[in-house]
From Swiss-Prot:
This is Propane 2-monooxygenase, reductase component. Induction: By acetone. Transcriptionally activated by MimR. Its EC number is 1.18.1.-. The gene is mimB. Belongs to the bacterial ring-hydroxylating dioxygenase ferredoxin reductase family.
């Protein structure tokens, strides 16, 4: 059995044990400690922390998430870090309410209820929890779906909320040769069973926050944002909200009627579909459509974006462009929450 070591987290005064054969983030999940995280693959930097004392070694990771100079200074990514002595680690990014009060990670057996195309490459997958009969999560989080017959998984965000405890919806982008998404072309059938593990992620509305919410999404990034909007509608949240969804053409838009209906229950809601290639074609309902990249459309409308909380979710080029725009407009980093589909576990 692997040796264990103690980890002390500063400045929150939390102690836990970690085995040498598990990374620190997984050890925290196992013990009910919910550290800030994103991709869990060493690519997004959400779990970046600073080693004050002790010996830590990292598995492979992206230098975009933690560059060589930072590593030399003592910065690590907890999702890739293994401890080989007792350690003291300074958390750079944490939510004190979440640390010991997050939803426990669950292993759930589910049954496929529906596989429904939404666009040419986005599919709605609806699963019913059967053992246990309920899956707890917060709006905006994601889960691992295990690929049938393998030890592999892919991660997808939930589009639903806890009000639909009998069903969990995922919006999945199909990729040629994708190990999970390719199964949605007739291989996964209604009645099949799929194992699910989660929830993960910090892409959630923060209790007690009052700033207006600006959501910027693209592709399957619709899922967690739709979950947030459904939650805001159900709870009669009083925060103003705007949603900018980037797509190429009208044929790439979906769930428009529901978004408009949700907006009726959200204070000062606005939805704009941003089309980068062509606005020619019919767009149902009273949807506002503007041509251009989603960041350009946001720039035209959000002249005081530094006084908002921004939620980003979509393909890496869109998220990277949005982060550059937000940085140029002096939006504080603690007011920006994002999921960027940077890892194979997200995008196939």
């Amino acid at each position: 059995m692997a040796d264990s070591h103690k980890i002390n987290f500063d400045p929150v005064d939390i102690e836990m044990e970690v085995r040498e054969d598990e990374n620190i983030l997984d050890a925290a999940f196992r013990q009910g400690i919910h550290l800030m995280h994103g991709c869990r693959e060493g690519r997004c930097s959400a779990c970046k922390s600073y080693v004050l004392d002790g010996e830590i070694q990292m598995e492979s990771y992206s230098t975009f998430a933690c560059n060589d100079a930072e590593v030399d200074e003592g910065y690590v990514l907890l999702c890739r870090s293994h401890a080989f002595s007792d350690c003291t680690i300074e958390l750079l990014n944490f939510d004190e309410d979440e640390l010991l009060g997050g939803i426990p990670i669950q292993d759930v057996r589910t049954q496929v209820q529906a596989v429904e195309p939404k666009t040419r490459d986005i599919v709605s997958l609806r699963l019913k929890p059967i053992e246990p009969g309920k899956f707890d999560f917060k709006p905006g989080q994601y889960a691992d779906l295990h690929i049938p017959g393998t030890d592999e998984h892919r991660s997808f965000s939930m589009a639903t909320t806890q009000s639909r405890s009998d069903e969990v919806e995922f919006l999945i982008k199909k990729y040629p040769g994708g190990k999970f998404s390719a199964l949605l072309d007739g291989h996964i059938q209604v009645g099949d069973e799929i194992a699910l593990t989660g929830p993960y992620g910090s892409f959630t509305l923060k209790d007690g926050h009052v700033l207006p919410v600006v959501c910027i999404g693209g592709g399957a990034g619709m899922a967690p944002i739709l979950s947030l909007l459904r939650h805001m509608n159900e709870t009669e949240n009083s925060r103003p909200a705007r949603f900018y969804y980037g797509a190429r053409t009208p044929a790439d838009l979906f769930y428009l009627d529901e978004i408009l209906e949700l907006g009726k229950g959200i204070k000062d809601f606005r939805f704009i579909a941003c089309l980068s290639e062509s606005a020619d074609g019919e767009v149902p309902g009273r949807v506002t459509v503007e041509e251009g990249m989603v960041t350009d459309v946001v720039a035209r409308h959000e002249t005081a974006i530094a006084k908002t909380e921004v939620y980003l979710c979509g393909p890496p080029p869109m998220v990277d462009a949005a982060l550059m725009f937000l940085d140029a407009n002096c939006v504080p980093k603690d007011q920006v929450f994002y999921d960027s589909f940077t890892s194979p576990i997200f995008d196939q």
